[in-house]
Amino acid sequence: MINVSFLGLMSGISVLLKTTVIVVGIFEGSNHLEDNGALEGYNDKIMEIVNGYQSFDGKFAEVLPIIGLEKDFPVVVVIGLGKSEDFDENKALKVGGVIYSELNRMKIPDASIVINTDSNVSANIGYGALLRSFKFDKYFVEKKDKNSVYLNKLVLFSKSEPQEVTALFNDLKAEGESIFLARSFVSEPPNILYPETYAQMIYEELSKVGVTVEVFDEDYMKANQMMALLGVGQGSAKKSRLVVMKWNGGDESESPIAFVGKGVTFDTGGISLKPSKGMWDMKYDMAGSASVVGIMRTLAARKAKVNAVGVVGLVENSVDGNAQRPSDVVISMSGQTIEVLNTDAEGRLVLADALWYTQEMFTPKLMVDLATLTGAVVVALGNNQYAGLFSNDDAIANQLIVAGNESGEKLWRLPLDEAYDKLIDSSIADMQNISTKGYGADSITAAQFLQRFVNGVPWVHLDIAGMAWDYEGTEICPKGATGFGVRLLNRFVSKYYESH
């Protein structure tokens, strides 16, 4: 993780000259740098060079390196900030990520950033660089050049007091460290991360920051009649686990907010076997659980004044002679029976018991579940654009949508309606786990299924199948696991539910 620190702009050019590279911003169409006088004496010369490049006009994320401004003067990298009226927290985050990527590509060890912004924007520039610096490279025997980390230190010069910016950044850093943990968990191969080992990893990592963690085995789940969850894992040599995480930062009388995550550490599809092509991606079918771990760690690390509980069901959906069969009927913890017609629609079975368990044990004020639940949501909303949101509560749904827009982790609401219920009615059980009546609406019927295991509690289901993994990378996330949901939920909690 890159080291990020902050100084005041009045520190001046003498401090800047000690760095390898100076990064300075410019708004689109502007005739001056956003340096607030820190580069006094050099501004005109830099602008003369900038104006000489017709291809550079300060559009968002454009980069122009200037070498040899003067003898022994640092390399200057000018970065476009786009239109000034559009430059906000999310744009700042992306600028920080672009700066990190460009400087690391140039093999620069350290740099200073001079952008005339307020404390919140400055902190987010640093945070964007931090988020983009994630590397999952533990299994390389020799680091290839493209996987090497060169940029280790960034100093941001802000017009705000350094202490103020640092305090804001430290809260963001706590969130970022949790996102890194979530990304790392999702990136782990399934021979390393499976229910037993994953549960132990969660215990070790979250105990460090003050989260109370309990790990429950299959005997405990059998005693609680969690047969929908256990049925998914019965074809695997890996034993299923239920992990409960608790953070009590609010008033003792306050009911907790609950986060529930699907943790299928590898999904073969079971007897309803997936095609071999692309099955390697199914290690990320536990991304919802990783996001729950991430938000619980974030709340504890920044000492959030809220009570929260996280519950994740951990299973491996594999195939052996004892594997669940299409047409099996299981009894869920709620007492409702489920005809399992497709063993590859397993995530909803895990969540059915996890949701019911959470309500019964903790009486939460609201529940949010996260799951890579359906491929259909990717068909509807695409990759890395929006997660699907389903809810029985308009107010909480709207709060999450606002938090998504503010954090950049956007949500699109899809319908729940009793008209879809008939699609999952079974002829021999209370319900079936897929629709066999026509085609389409698979994400909706999955959410409609989950709603049958919500007993009067305000609830939101987030289908993050299109958001958990990025095949190309973004300004703030390299190719691979995204840690989607941690920033969204942290904003949601801090904006609407935390005591300030």
Swiss-Prot record:
Binds 2 manganese ions per subunit. Mn(2+) 1 binds at D267, D344, E346. It catalyses: Release of an N-terminal amino acid, Xaa-|-Yaa-, in which Xaa is preferably Leu, but may be other amino acids including Pro although not Arg or Lys, and Yaa may be Pro. Amino acid amides and methyl esters are also readily hydrolyzed, but rates on arylamides are exceedingly low; Release of an N-terminal amino acid, preferentially leucine, but not glutamic or aspartic acids. One of its GO terms (molecular function) is metalloaminopeptidase activity. PROSITE patterns: CYTOSOL_AP. Presumably involved in the processing and regular turnover of intracellular proteins. Catalyzes the removal of unsubstituted N-terminal amino acids from various peptides. This is Probable cytosol aminopeptidase. It comes from Ehrlichia ruminantium (strain Welgevonden).
